[in-house]
Amino acid sequence: MRISTRIVASLVVVGALATASPAQAVVVPRHAINVCQSASFYDNYDSASGPYGLKRVLEYGNKVGHTPGAHPVYNGWAATFDFGPNDWGYMRIECIGGYDSW
């Protein structure tokens, strides 16, 4: 690859990154726990039909993460991080509590 081609390719990548939307900024989830006896943890949420793709059922005390005001809540279903298997999903907002307890 010639040097001029490398420079052009680098400039194209830099230009694409400069025009990318900053709305996808990563916010670290605030430590919390599941405060319900059990809580369904779903893969995703659809505004028309609600949550779908049951991943697992969380027990009381499972370590989760959610940052109020930064992570979305749709009709009571909150985007939540499950620190056990380290993945994102949706659970009921009223089952998230004990913030900063661990």
Question: What spans do the regions from the language model cover?
Answer:
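Beta-loop motif signature
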Residues: P29-N75
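N-terminal prepro-regions of secreted/extracellular proteins
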Residues: M1-A32
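General "foldedness" signal
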Residues: G15-L17, S21-P22, K55, G61, ...
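Secreted/processed peptides and extracellular or luminal domains of membrane proteins
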Residues: Y42, S101-W102
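Short, functionally important structural connectors and interaction interfaces within domains
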Residues: A9-L11, G50, F83
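SH3/SH3-like beta-barrel superfamily modules
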Residues: L58-S101
